[in-house]
Amino acid sequence: MVKFRFAPSPTGHLHAGNARLAVVNALAARAMGGTLLLRIDDTDRERSKPEYEAGIEQDLRWLGIGWDEMARQSDRMDRYAAAAERLKAAGLLYPCFESEEELAAKRALRAKRHLPPVYDRAMLSLTAEQRAAAEAGGKRPYFRFKLSDGAVAWNDLVLGRREVALGTVSDPVLIRADGTPLYTFTSVVDDLELGVTHVVRGEDHVTNTAVQIDLMRALEPRRAVPAFGHLPLISDVTGEKLSKRAGSVSVRQFRRDGIEAMALVSYLARLGSRRDPEPLTLEELAGTFDLGDFSRGAPRFDPKQLLALNRRVLHGLPFEAVAERLPEGCGAEFWMAVRGNLDLLSEARLWWEVVSGEIETPSLPEAASLLRAALEALPPEPWDETTWKGWTGAVAAASGARGKALYLPLRLALTGESHGPELAALLPLIGRARAAARLERAAG
């Protein structure tokens, strides 16, 4: 069974970079007929918060992303402890006693000698007596995994063949001095025990993947490791790293700003791929989804492109899809009249005020004669979408005005705006009494 996973840490709000990974993993799982595991990586006791976890789940549901299985790392501490004991028994997890200052001094010395900052494995040579003496002196050990010799290679689902020489990498710390397991370790144990077959994450994990593959082989030598894929990290429009601490790129903020879930999902699903973004459902996106479509260059997250896609989404939404989010009293006729002019759904409220409330009618003394002619030619109700053409034809005949000289003063008087939805559709919604009052006020 194919199983992908999305593994956020509940240390903040879900941001665009992580949301993209959620979308990509969900789509890949659907495309391959597999399942999606939501794993909450909450071993950082100080920074992990229940409210962030709840917020992540809420954001995923808003995006339309469901999961088939859920796991929480804080519930699996016994599994990490058991795996650590197996590694210790095999001589692959060894205690270390250096302080941060001592490690920094070692790195500085290696840099001075023009050597890579790789851990020197000094603690491997400690005798049992030396270790006991260190602990008796109040030092608490942290534990490193002894990497294999040679290199680790894999066929990356996005980047192609990748190879990392393990001699260029420090033996990773798996267990802190306080006994807390670190991500490199917990992630491997979870992927093995929970049956994850595909891991798709950011390109910043490439070296970490080599380490984790080596660790997987140490824990389960007879088991196939998952397939790995690494997406290039998102940058902003200037090419700089997209900061996940910038509130403006959190899913929560996009939602508050009025971005539609379909627009955000469609944008993130195609960001960095050879396919142009278009407004599609998750099912439609999954139908053509292929990890091989993603390029190896860093994609740029452009809010203007997202807004343009949001506009396209709104223009195609039926009334039933938005009815509950529109101002009270709005009907299908209103929605069909204004949807083609919206960037954000919240803008519908402004046009509802235009057709049903009071507006600040501009004074247009230079167009007074035209507006009085329009008032006199205003036909009796009932009105429909043909009323506008007949009425403006009569006004043109009476005033001699044509084109912009005819239509702009009427639009300003009736809506208070110089641009907007087609007046043929708005006029029946405004109604005769309101239209007459506005024309009279504008004429002065």
Swiss-Prot record:
Class of this enzyme: ligase
Catalytic activity as recorded in UniProt: tRNA(Glu) + L-glutamate + ATP = L-glutamyl-tRNA(Glu) + AMP + diphosphate
Cited PROSITE patterns: AA_TRNA_LIGASE_I
List of residues binding ATP: 244
Subunit structure: Monomer.
Family affiliation: Belongs to the class-I aminoacyl-tRNA synthetase family. Glutamate--tRNA ligase type 1 subfamily.
Protein purpose: Catalyzes the attachment of glutamate to tRNA(Glu) in a two-step reaction: glutamate is first activated by ATP to form Glu-AMP and then transferred to the acceptor end of tRNA(Glu).
Name of the featured protein: Glutamate--tRNA ligase 2
Natural source organism: Acidiphilium cryptum (strain JF-5)
Gene from which this protein is expressed: gltX2
